[in-house]
A protein has these predicted regions:
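Acidic side chains
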Residues: 15-16, 87, 106, 152, ...
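Short, surface-exposed, polar/charged, turn-prone segments marking secondary-structure boundaries
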Residues: 38-41, 73-78, 106-110, 143-147, ...
Length: 206
C-alpha cells in the first residue's frame, strides 16, 4: 500500500439518471458503484451533480464551476461524465456534440482531473435508438482519440429484454432496479478499478 497516495474525489455529472431516477430501491447505478468502491485508504468520496434534461452544451458550460467546489488541491480529482441523448431533442449537431465533450475532457485533463466517460443508454423509442447509437459512437471516438476510458452502455442494453421491459413499463421512461444494476455492472467491468488504479476486495482496498 502506498501511504503517500492522495484521497480520491469523484464528481459525476449528467442528467436525472445519476440521481437514481426510476430505481425503486433509490440506489441507482451510481449508488451501486459507490457501494463497490469503498476503502479506508485512500478515502474515496463521490459527488453526484444531476441536472434534469441537461445536454452536452450545458454540461460543457457548467461542469467546471460546480465540480471545482468539490475538488481540492490536496486530493486526486476525478470526473465521471454520464452522457445522455438530450442533444438529439435539443437539435445539437453531431459535430457540436463531439466538440462539447472534447471541451469537457480537454479542460479536465489540463487541470489534472482524470475523466471517465459513460455513454447514453437506449431509449424505449426504437426509432430514437438509431440516432442514439450514432451519437454514442461519436462520443466514443472523442474519448478514444484521447485514450480515455469509455463505457458503452448502449449496445449491450439496446436488445436486452429485462432492460427494455422496464423502460416500456416506466412512467418516465427510466430504467428500474434491473436496469440500474446492469449499467453499474457495465461500468464496474469496463476498467473502473483500472481507472482508479486501485484494487478492491469486499469493499476494502488491497
Amino acid at each position: 500500500m502506498n501511504e503517500t497516495r492522495k484521497n480520491i474525489r469523484i464528481v459525476i455529472i449528467g442528467d436525472d439518471l445519476i440521481s437514481s431516477g426510476g430505481d425503486p430501491k433509490g440506489l441507482g447505478w451510481v449508488g451501486r458503484i459507490v457501494a463497490k468502491t469503498q476503502s479506508e485508504f485512500p478515502r474515496v468520496d463521490f459527488y453526484a451533480l444531476p441536472t434534469p434534461e441537461v445536454n452536452s452544451a450545458q454540461l460543457a458550460d457548467q461542469w467546471l464551476d460546480e465540480a471545482s467546489k468539490r475538488f481540492s488541491a490536496d486530493t486526486d480529482n476525478r470526473l465521471v461524465i454520464a452522457l445522455n441523448a438530450n442533444d438529439i431533442n435539443a437539435g445539437i449537431s453531431m459535430s457540436r456534440s463531439r466538440l462539447n465533450l472534447a471541451n469537457i475532457l480537454d479542460t479536465a485533463t489540463s487541470k489534472g482531473v482524470q475523466p471517465f466517460i459513460v455513454s447514453p443508454i437506449p431509449s424505449r423509442n426504437p426509432q430514437l435508438n438509431y440516432e442514439i447509437e450514432h451519437l454514442s459512437s461519436g462520443f466514443e471516438d472523442v474519448a478514444a482519440r484521447r485514450s480515455l476510458p469509455f463505457v458503452d452502455a448502449f449496445r449491450p442494453l439496446v436488445d436486452h429484454k429485462g432492460f427494455n421491459d422496464e423502460l416500456r413499463n416506466a412512467t418516465f421512461g427510466m430504467p428500474g432496479q434491473q436496469g440500474h444494476g446492469l449499467i453499474a455492472w457495465l461500468v464496474l467491468n469496463q476498467n473502473w478499478y483500472g481507472w482508479l488504479a486501485v484494487k478492491f476486495l469486499f469493499g476494502r482496498l488491497v
